[in-house]
A protein has these predicted regions:
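N-terminal export/targeting and maturation segments
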Residues: 16, 21-105
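N-terminal Sec-pathway targeting helices
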Residues: 1-24
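Extracytoplasmic electrostatic interaction patches
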Residues: 65-179
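Generic low-complexity, intrinsically disordered sequence content enriched
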Residues: 5-7, 23, 36, 113, ...
Length: 179
C-alpha cells in the first residue's frame, strides 16, 4: 500500500516535470521564432542584414498580414511585396537536398541563395536559361534590394522587443549563421 502511494507520487512528479519542460520549450520556441528578426538585429553578426532577411522569411507567420504584402506559409514560405511585385521565398531546393532562399524579381530574374544567403545561381524565366557566370553580379546590391523591398516588415520586426529576452539562446541556435 505504501509502495503504491510512493509510485503515484513519483508518477505525478514526473508528469509535472514533463509538463513544465514542455511549457518552457513551447514558450521558448514561440519567442525565438516570433522575435527572430529582433534577435538577428541584435546579434554579434558582422552582417545583420543577411541574418534579418533569413529570419524574416524562415519564421514568417500566417497571421503576420500587413498592407502591401501577402504571405504563403504552406510548403515553401513566401512573402510577396504586392506593390513592387517581388517575392522572397524559403523552401526545399529542387536541385539538391538543402533548403534555399529565392528572390524573384519582376523583370524575370530569379536569384537563388544557399542556406547562408550566398548567391548560388540566377535563372532568367523569360529566356528560360541559367546565367553561367554569377561572379559578374553584385551580390551585395541584390541583398540590399531585398532588404529595401521588405523593409517595412523588417523595421517593424526589428523593433518588436520580446517579452523574455532569449538573445543568448538565439545566438547559440544560429551560431553557424552568425559570422
Amino acid at each position: 500500500m505504501v509502495l503504491r502511494k510512493e509510485i503515484r507520487k513519483m508518477i505525478k512528479k514526473i508528469i509535472m516535470v514533463i509538463l513544465a519542460l514542455a511549457t518552457i520549450w513551447f514558450i521558448g520556441d514561440i519567442n525565438l521564432k516570433g522575435s527572430s528578426v529582433y534577435y538577428a538585429k541584435h546579434s554579434p553578426s558582422s552582417n545583420t542584414r543577411d541574418l534579418e532577411i533569413m529570419m524574416l522569411v524562415e519564421n514568417i507567420q500566417a497571421s503576420a498580414d500587413r498592407e502591401g504584402f501577402s504571405y504563403e506559409v504552406d510548403g515553401d514560405k513566401t512573402i510577396q511585396n504586392t506593390t513592387k511585385n517581388v517575392y522572397l521565398s524559403y523552401g526545399h531546393s529542387v536541385n539538391d537536398d538543402n533548403y534555399e532562399y529565392a528572390y524573384m524579381y519582376e523583370n524575370g530574374l530569379d536569384y537563388y541563395f544557399d542556406n547562408f544567403l550566398k548567391l548560388k545561381r540566377i535563372y532568367n524565366s523569360k529566356e528560360a536559361r541559367y546565367y553561367k557566370d554569377i561572379l559578374t553580379v553584385d551580390e551585395n546590391k541584390i541583398k540590399e534590394e531585398i532588404y529595401e523591398d521588405f523593409k517595412p516588415i523588417l523595421k517593424e520586426s526589428e523593433e518588436n522587443k520580446p517579452f523574455i529576452n532569449l538573445q543568448w539562446i538565439f545566438n547559440w541556435v544560429y551560431r553557424d549563421r552568425i559570422k
